[in-house]
A protein has these predicted regions:
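Intrinsically disordered, low-complexity repeat and linker tracts
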Residues: 145-147, 258-261, 271-273, 278-285, ...
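Conserved catalytic neighborhood of penicillin-recognizing serine enzymes
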Residues: 21-77, 125, 137-169
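Periplasmic/cell-envelope proteins involved in peptidoglycan metabolism and beta-lactam response
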Residues: 1, 23-26, 81, 94, ...
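Secondary-structure transition/capping motifs at alpha-helix termini
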Residues: 17-26, 87-89, 121-126, 243
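A penicillin-recognizing enzyme superfamily signal
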Residues: 106-299
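Structural recognition of the beta-strand scaffold that forms the well-ordered cores
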Residues: 26-27, 55, 65-68, 80, ...
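Mid-domain, small-residue-enriched loop/turn segments at the edges of structured enzyme/sensor domains
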Residues: 39-41, 73-114
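Active-site SXXK
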Residues: 2-28, 56, 115-119, 163, ...
């Protein structure tokens, strides 16, 4: 069956982080997007603007996923999906739709579970088995599958941990909150649905177990609800972890941290990225060693704005009417960032209220200078007083 958004991790984000030069901080512009005759949409039918891969995983944002695969190349995504153990892929799946789980023949739940178990197993694939041994009543081994036939490293250990950390956010603040069973046990997962809710899935794991739940009809009928796979995942996983010690996923030594701007994935500009009108965009992200960005944010800009005109201040704008503001640059129309964007037209225009004439008009009249202290006062002469005649 179709794996829906659970395949975003497999065919897009795993190769993007492992070999595509991307990090969890890398951004794409979540805005209206069309390739050829195909227009892509998000489940929410909203567009968030510049969005990081971490957030795109957490909130299951389609457009960021498709643009990321477009960047790294469809062939790379297909190659990684094959290496994760999917045997049903065909050449017709070599298109951007693979990033959203749009596959010609779909996948089996067993192979999807094995792929997610690969991430949980620090990137190492183990061929799945339904049993390890079958014994007779005397304890003699009748069937033995303790030896794994196929074992290979699909993604780097660091990549597996980074994907896991992002999928932990899915459980606590994203599309998988309904599946989260608490108890202090670390949990990572990814939800998935297909067109008209014909398929509903939840794939996730803990430091102990991996579980994938698919729900749908044999005849591919439309479903009215898609949350029940999460409920089932939660019920099963909570029960089998009841007596297990709570623990987190072990972080590899090759993981480091750095402060970046959420709108560019690059190093924040001092007094710029933290002055975004929506609040500071600086946050701390995890990186594999050697992938921390070295360039500064290129999606924020600081401008001097004249309050009287609301435009870029010119040379004649009074200082007491000029303020510094932070804007987004490069945002596409239709996205949440666009209302905060300094467009090319805005950048090329300046204040049309203040000019040389208004500057002269606003100059106060000069007061006469006070005389110096040693200046002698000018002599004054009173007019002669002529005695009045006494008229009788």
């Amino acid at each position: 069956r179709q794996p829906g958004s659970t395949f975003k991790i497999i065919a897009c984000y795993a190769p993007a982080l492992d070999a595509g030069g991307k990090t969890l901080a890398s951004v794409q512009d979540d805005a209206p997007f069309t390739v050829g005759n195909k227009t892509y949409n998000n489940y929410s039918h909203t567009f968030g603007g510049f969005t990081s891969i971490r957030k795109a995983i957490t909130k299951s944002i389609n457009i960021v996923t498709v643009k990321t695969l477009q960047d790294i190349g469809v062939d790379l995504g297909y190659e990684y999906a094959e290496n994760f153990g999917f045997s049903t892929l065909t050449d017709t799946d070599r298109n951007l739709g693979i990033s959203l789980g749009g596959l010609t023949q779909g996948v089996t739940n067993l192979e999807l579970t094995a792929a997610y178990a690969t991430i949980a197993n620090q990137g190492e694939y183990n061929e799945p088995n339904f049993y390890t041994q079958v014994l007779d009543h005397d304890g003699n081994v009748l069937l033995d599958k303790t030896q794994i036939k196929e074992q290979r490293q699909v993604i780097k250990e660091d990549t597996a941990w980074l994907l896991t950390d992002a999928m932990k956010d899915v459980m606590t603040s994203g599309t998988g909150m309904r599946a989260y069973f608490g108890t202090g046990m670390a949990q990572a997962g990814k939800s998935g649905t297909t067109t008209l809710n014909r398929d509903a899935l939840f794939a996730g794991f803990t430091p102990y177990y991996t579980c994938v739940v698919w729900g749908g009809y044999d005849d591919n009928s439309i479903q009215s609800a898609t949350g029940y796979p999460k409920n089932l995942w939660k019920a099963v996983m909570k029960r089998i972890h009841a007596d297990l010690k709570a623990k987190d996923f072990e972080k590899p030594s090759g993981i480091t941290q750095a402060v970046v701007c959420a709108k560019s994935g690059l190093l924040p500009e001092t007094d710029v990225c933290d002055k975004d009108p929506r609040g500071t965009q600086s946050y701390t992200e995890y990186f594999a060693e050697g992938t921390v960005p070295t360039e500064n944010c290129d999606h924020h800009i600081s401008l001097q704005i004249c309050e009287a005109s609301g435009k870029v201040a010119g040379e004649y704008c009074p200082a007491d009417q000029v303020v510094t503001k932070t804007y987004i640059v490069g945002a596409e129309k239709g996205s949440a960032d666009y209302q905060y964007c300094a467009t090319e037209k805005f950048l090329n225009g300046t204040c049309n209220i203040h000019d040389a004439e208004t500057q002269d008009e606003e100059k106060p009249e000069e007061e006469p200078a006070d005389p110096p202290d040693d200046a002698k006062p000018e002599e004054t002469h009173e007019p002669e007083q002529i005695p009045e005649k006494n008229e009788e």
